[in-house]
C-alpha cells in the first residue's frame, strides 16, 4: 500500500485496533493501533494478549492490507475489550519519525534497545540490540542473543533492507535491562 492509501484507511480509525497484513513477508497478520503514517513508515502501538506491547515502525510498501473492525467482527470485540480495559491511555511513541533514517538517528542518540527486521529475497533476519552508529545508509548495532550474550562483533544493517523496527516491547526491553553492556 502507498502512504496515502494507508492514511486514508487509518484516518477514521482513531485509537482503534486494526489488523495489518504484510502479505509478502508474513503469513501472520499483526494487531496494531496506528499512531501516524509518515512518508515511508507506519508507526503503531503493538497489541498482544489484550495489552500494548511496545511500538512498531513498518515500511509502508510491505503492507498489503489493513482491516478494520467494520470488516472483522473479532476486531470489533477486541476494540470493546481495549476500551473497557482502559488501554487507550498507553503513551504514544516518543519517536515521531517518518523514515528509517530519521528513526535510526534518534535511536543512536537514545540508546534504546530495538529489534530490527530485515527482509532479503530468500530470508528474513532479526537483530536485537542497540543502534550505536549511523553512517550513510548503514547502521551499526551491538546485538545480543536469547541468552543475554553480546555478539563479539557489531552488526552492520543496510537501511534499504529494514522492513520493521520494534521497540519498547517487553521482551527486548527486559533483556536489554539485564545485559552487561
Kindly give the residue locations of the regions a language model identified.
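Short, conserved beta-turn/loop elements at beta-strand boundaries and strand-helix junctions
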Residues: 37-42, 68-72, 134-139, 167-170
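N-terminal beta-strand/beta-hairpin edge segment
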Residues: 33-51
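Short glycine-rich, low-complexity segments
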Residues: 1-28, 47-124, 145-181
Amino acid at each position: 500500500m502507498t502512504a496515502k492509501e494507508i492514511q486514508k484507511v487509518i484516518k477514521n480509525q482513531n485509537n482503534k485496533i486494526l489488523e495489518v497484513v504484510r502479505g509478502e513477508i508474513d503469513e501472520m497478520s499483526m494487531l496494531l493501533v496506528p499512531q501516524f503514517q509518515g512518508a515511508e513508515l507506519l508507526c503503531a502501538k503493538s497489541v498482544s494478549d489484550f495489552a500494548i506491547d511496545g511500538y512498531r515502525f513498518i515500511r509502508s510498501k510491505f503492507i498489503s492490507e489493513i482491516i478494520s473492525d467494520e470488516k472483522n467482527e473479532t476486531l470489533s470485540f477486541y476494540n470493546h475489550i481495549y476500551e473497557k480495559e482502559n488501554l487507550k491511555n498507553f503513551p504514544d511513541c516518543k519517536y515521531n519519525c517518518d523514515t528509517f533514517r530519521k528513526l535510526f538517528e534518534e535511536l543512536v542518540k537514545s540508546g534504546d534497545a530495538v529489534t530490527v527486521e530485515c527482509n532479503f529475497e530468500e530470508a528474513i533476519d532479526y537483530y536485537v540490540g542497540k543502534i550505536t552508529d549511523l553512517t550513510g545508509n548503514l547502521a551499526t548495532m551491538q546485538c545480543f542473543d536469547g541468552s543475554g550474550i553480546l555478539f563479539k562483533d557489531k552488526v552492520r544493517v543496510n537501511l534499504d533492507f529494514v522492513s520493521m523496527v520494534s521497540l519498547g516491547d517487553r521482551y527486548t526491553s527486559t533483556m536489554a535491562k539485564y545485559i552487561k553492556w
